[in-house]
Amino acid sequence: MQTVEFPYRSSSHLILLHVVAESGAWEKHGLDVNYDYKIGSEDAQAGINSGELAFCGGNHVSTYGLRARGSKWVYLGQTVNNVYHSLVVRPDSGINSVRDIRGKKLGGVGSHPILNNWLYLKQRGLDQDRGDYELVMQEEYKPGTMDPTEPEKKLPPLWHWVRDGKVDAAFVGMPSSLFAKAAGLKVIDVEPLPMIQFSSISTNLDFVERHPDLVERFMKGLLEGIAFFKTRPDKAIEIIQRRYTKAGQMTREQAALTHRSLDSVLEAKMFPTMKAIANVYQEALRHDPDDAARVNPMELWNVHHLRRLDDQGFIDGLYGNQRAAAHRHDGAVDQLNTE
C-alpha cells in the first residue's frame, strides 16, 4: 500500500473525503491516503513545491500570483463549482434579502469565504470598498497571505455571532445553516456563486510528470469515491453523521440534508466550469493584483488525466445505465472554505 499525502485547507472537505476513504476506493488502487489533517496556505505551497506533498485539497486564490513568480502549481480536477450558501440573520433584523445588508455588519471567517462575500455582494451592487456594509472578521490574516495570524485559535461558529448580536448577518452553508435554523435564526435562501472551492486536486506539474501512474490511481479512487457518495446515499449519510462532527453533531435528518446538498453540486466528472474559474480569478486579482494580472487563469488547469479517463468511458461506467452527467444537479453546499 502506497501512502499519499492529501491534506485539506478547510475541514468542510471532510464531508466528502470521509466517504471516499470509507468506500475503499483509494485502497482498491493500492493507496493509503492521509487526508484527515489541515494545512495552511503557505505550508501547502511549500509542500507542493518541494514534493513533500503529493496533493493538496485547496489553495484556490493565491496560486495565480504564484504562477507568475515561477510556481508549477497545477489543478487536476474540481469537485464543486458553486458556493451554495444561505444568509443567516436574526428574525427581528429587518433583513429579508441580500440588498438589505446595506448599512449592516456582515460577519466573515476564512480568507476565501471572505473574498467570496466581497465578490458576491459586489456583483449585486454592494461594494465593501465603498462602505456599503461593514465586514467584521472573526480572525486576522498575515499581510499578503491567506493564512490567519493565530491558526490554532478556537473560533465559534459564525452563526453564533449573528445570534449573539455581534453582527447582523452572515453567509453560511450546510450543516451550519441547519444548526442556525434549529437555534431560531432566520435562514434566507440566496442565489449561488460560481466558484472554484471545496476540494480541488492540487499538485505540482513536475510531480505529475514523474508519477503518472500514481496520479491516475489517485484520480480513479476519488472518482469512484464520488460515485459511491452519489449512488450509495444511505451509507454515505451514515458516514457523514458518524465522522463529520467539526461543525457539531448532526442528527440523521441533518446529515441527510447535508448529503443531499453536496450531492446536488458534486461534479461526477470533476471538470471545472468557466464561470467558476472566472470568478476565482477576480478574487486572485484582488488578493495579488500585480502578479495575478500577469497570468492567464487557464495556465493552472491540467485536466488531460480526467479527459482521458472520461474518453475511455471510465467515469460513466461507474454509474451503470445512468451517465455521470445525470448526477449533477442544483443544490446547496457549505462554504466553510479557507482558501
Residue ranges of predicted features:
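Predominant activation on well-ordered alpha-helical scaffold segments within soluble catalytic domains
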Residues: 18, 64, 114, 118, ...
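Short linear loop/turn motifs
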Residues: 34, 42, 133-136, 255-263, ...
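Short secondary-structure transition/capping segments
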Residues: 46-48, 68-70, 87-88, 181-184, ...
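Pocket-lining segment of extracytoplasmic ligand-binding domains
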Residues: 145-246
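Secondary-structure end/capping motifs
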Residues: 211-293
